[in-house]
Every structure is written in C-alpha cells, then in structure tokens.
Design a protein with these regions (language model features):
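Asparagine-centered strand-capping/turn motif at beta-strand->loop junctions
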Residues: 62-69
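N-terminal secretory signal peptides
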Residues: 12-54
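Structural beta-strand segments of beta-rich domains
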Residues: 57-61
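Intrinsically disordered, low-complexity Pro/Gly/Ser/Thr-rich segments with frequent PxxP/GP/PP motifs
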Residues: 15-21, 27, 79-114
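Sec-dependent N-terminal signal peptides
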Residues: 2-12
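Short, hydrophobic/aromatic beta-strand segments
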Residues: 71-76
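Short, low-complexity, Pro/Ser/Thr/Gly-rich segments in the mature regions of secreted, periplasmic
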Residues: 110-124
Length: 124
C-alpha cells in the first residue's frame, strides 16, 4: 500500500485539469512542470504544450505541442466517485500540431503524466 507521502509525490508529478480548463506547461524528466491556467486560445511558446479539457461526448482533451519532440503520455480519467481509469492515448505530435482524445466516460478531471519521447505516430 502506498504511503500518503509517496501518493502525494506521485500526484504532484502529474497535471490535473478539470473540464473547462486550459493549461500551458513544459516537460522535464517526463513530467509536466511550470503549469499555469490560461485562456483556451492561448498560444504555447516554443517548448510548451497547451492542454484543454471539455465535456463533449463524455470527456475530450485537446493538446497543442509547440516543441520539436513527439511524445507518448499517460492520461488518467478521474470520476465523480474519485475512481480512476487509465485511458488509451495517442501520440502527441511535435511542431505545433494538435492532438485530440475523446473517451465516453464523464470525468471530473484528467491527469496527464509520464511523457516519453517517441518516433511513433500511432495510438497505443
């Protein structure tokens, strides 16, 4: 069983976004850093990623990656009951290209973490 300190450290390494929120962040050691709430149309600076969450046909996430690196990542849906589901996610393409994910589950938050550089172009 995870201790509260280890659990808090694991959660601190992820970014949680609620429906209606948009965030800009950078990646360091595979985890989101320097995250800040922004307007949905905010333009990511070089090296930044914009994450937006919406309630549309369940839960929808869009990400715009303004870095030269393509990533895979883990997306975890948090339900109203606090239970989590690790969701299938596709690659996050580089060079200011948009990625969109949609899941049928309604989530109160989406956590993203474990970003890994990849050369893949397909979903996992």
């Amino acid at each position: 069983m995870a201790t509260p300190l280890l659990l808090a450290a694991a959660l601190a390494a992820s970014l949680s976004a609620q429906p209606g929120e948009s965030w800009l962040f950078r990646i360091a050691n595979g985890q989101p850093i320097a995250a800040r709430l922004v307007a949905p149309n905010a333009t990511p600076a070089r090296g930044e990623i914009r994450l937006s969450v919406k309630r549309m046909l369940g839960t929808t996430v869009t990400m715009l990656n303004n870095s030269p690196q393509t990533y895979t990542y883990r997306a975890t849906l948090v339900g109203a009951d606090g239970k989590t589901i690790v969701a299938k996610s596709c690659v996050l393409p580089a060079h200011n290209r948009l990625a969109m994910e949609s899941w049928p589950q309604v989530a109160v938050a989406v956590r993203v973490d474990s970003f890994k550089p990849t050369r893949e172009t397909n979903c996992r």
